């Protein structure tokens, strides 16, 4: 079962597009650089089903299935991914994005992320391309 993350365009026609397997509207103008290819490789090395997307100049979103089992996450590669985001991608914030708004940090993978230092993103602080009514997000400030 695959989950789908929908990002909204902030243009007048309110189109939205599934993130999984397609280029999102927010990064259609991002060049295919060695750094972005390496980012994709590093994300997939943590968990093969994960995706990533730029969420502005200094933020990236890691798209994680809502039912992610923490035992399937390669922990040292996850730490390597966070270091890569800081040192190579030069981002200031990594946002874990889940395709369900009803998740909490009380259980599941969000609970694990809390112990690593991720904090819940309040709906009013979501990046403009994420819909707070259909997503749960946690942020890690690099």
Swiss-Prot record:
GO terms for biological process: positive regulation of protein catabolic process; viral translational frameshifting. One of its GO terms (cellular component) is nucleus. Signal peptide: none annotated. Gene3D superfamilies: 3.40.630.60. Pfam families: ODC_AZ. GO terms for molecular function: ornithine decarboxylase inhibitor activity. Residues 1-19 have a biased composition (Low complexity). Transmembrane segments: none annotated. Belongs to the ODC antizyme family. Ornithine decarboxylase (ODC) antizyme protein that negatively regulates ODC activity and intracellular polyamine biosynthesis and uptake in response to increased intracellular polyamine levels. Binds to ODC monomers, inhibiting the assembly of the functional ODC homodimer, and targets the monomers for ubiquitin-independent proteolytic destruction by the 26S proteasome. Interacts with ODC1 and thereby sterically blocks ODC homodimerization. This is Ornithine decarboxylase antizyme.
